[in-house]
Amino acid sequence: MHQNVLMKDRFFIRVLLFILSIVFLAECAKRGRPEGGPKDEDAPIMVTAKPPHFTTNFREKEIKIYFDEYIKLKDLQTQLVVSPPLKYQPIIVPQGTPSKYISIKILDTLKSNTTYTFNFGESVIDNTEGNILHNFKYVFSTGDIIDSLKVNGTVKDAFEREADKNITVMLYEFNKEFTDSIIYKEKPLYVANTLDTTAWEITNIKEGKYLLVGLKDVAKNYLFNPKNDKIGFVKEVISVPKDTSYTLNLFEETLPFKLQRVAEAKKNKMLIGYEGEIDSIKIEPLFGPDDFESITLFEKTKDTANVWFKGSVADSLLFRVKTGNVIDTAKVMLRSKEIDSLQISINAKGVLNLRDHIKIAGNIPLQSIDTSKVYFVDKDTLKVPYSYQLKKEKTEAFVEIDFDKKYNDKYNLTLYPDAVTDFLGNANKDTLNFNFTTKKPTDYGNLYLTLQNVKSYPIIVQLITEKGELIEEVYATEQQEYNFTNLPPTKYLVRVIYDDNKNKKRDAGNFLQKIQPEKVIYYPTVLDIRANWDMSETFLLE
């Protein structure tokens, strides 16, 4: 009996110890506030560091930074900025688990007489409530002094309304070895990052002269790649110290034309892939045929040109590609026997806005229309007088139909067989019916815009949607009023482009040529256009 009691007591003690150990371990892992206690709203505090913060004559390979509570590192890969950049990424713990210290193992050979900054951004948080230790830095110098000068400023996008996040801002020392090509092949001396803001600050800089550059550094390698990266720069070399804040306008450089690939897509159609920005391509066969003709349209969203051609072409085509001052040659093998069938569409899908024309387009560029095979009537089946134009733009060739629109009316447009013909001679085989309506003027709004403080002409005034879709563009060479009428109710933006070189389009900058992008100014507020409403706005350009 006594033995049974002892066994039960021992079992009870073991169970109790097991439960207590689980509770203890859980509390150790959690390190949280007592249930019902006040919420912890304090950020972690650095207690000490080995070697100490602001150490000079630094020679260590490992740094340990201690805090007053358990911390975690969040988004360290994007938040941490080491200046000057290191060739090899340091090993940093903890990552994913809580700890009372940060360990940094340096794998590089450090530069002599240089101040290094480890800026953790917003990555250091406490383990329980996620309170952020904002802009936490650890600084040391391999020389006798800690450099203490700084440079700051903001970034903006040269064309878009909002700037990108995580812009890398860099300083290159301007010395006797300096060349502009340094940004393509060497890491900068000092760096900072805007993170999720538009502001930046580079600290712990030594006195001197520097090239100041900002990058949307896609590869995160501190090197400028014009194919992928946006760049902004200050044209003149800057001096530190100087009581100046700098704004970097980031843009994508326009790459020179480069032919990349040529392939047959269908019979009498080939694709030309290219690099760069171009407005037109001319195709010239090198060895005939004499009856060769072609038409080129560009894709809207990728660097590809669609080329339709006709003539007595055999099983291959050797041709010259000309664009501007660039000439290249290419060859395409012609094996396809299948030609595209013509497919017709119009822009009036349900409702035709009062400000729009009817646009008849095809998957193959349209070349003619037979008006005897077009039937256009209103809701009373009365014939609608119209005029038409054959138009070719950069991305499409189409038939545009204009007519006097009646308000709140219904229309039917019928294309009988052979009404429209494409570049290759195909015509629509079936009868095509398109029904659409118009609305009342009171269903639309109007915007009347006045510009003030225009520095120079010509300018390009654009009305766009919040998504960046171009609604209307006005090219102005002198002071005038800008009337945007019959606008569907939605939200719009206005931007003004200074066309400095008078080529009727926006031009980007170029780093090596030290050309800044043409200036773009957005109206500061979104314009909410409402039905049956006139809006008058004055835009003061700064």
Predicted regions and their residues:
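Structured interaction patches on ligand/partner-binding surfaces of diverse proteins
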Residues: 134-135, 217-254, 333-340, 424-432, ...
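Short, flexible beta-strand-to-coil junctions
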Residues: 175, 216-219, 275, 454, ...
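Intrinsically disordered, low-complexity terminal regions enriched in Ser/Thr/Pro/Gly
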Residues: 446-447
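Sec-dependent bacterial lipoprotein signal peptides
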Residues: 1-28
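Compositionally biased, intrinsically disordered linkers/stalks adjacent to structured regions
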Residues: 257, 365, 369, 454-455, ...
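Acidic, low-complexity Ser/Thr/Gly/Pro-rich repeat segments typical of extracellular/periplasmic
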Residues: 9, 27-215, 227-233, 252-443, ...
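Short beta-strand and adjacent turn/loop elements
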Residues: 411, 415, 486-487, 493-499, ...
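C-terminal structured domain segments across diverse proteins
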Residues: 426, 454-464, 492
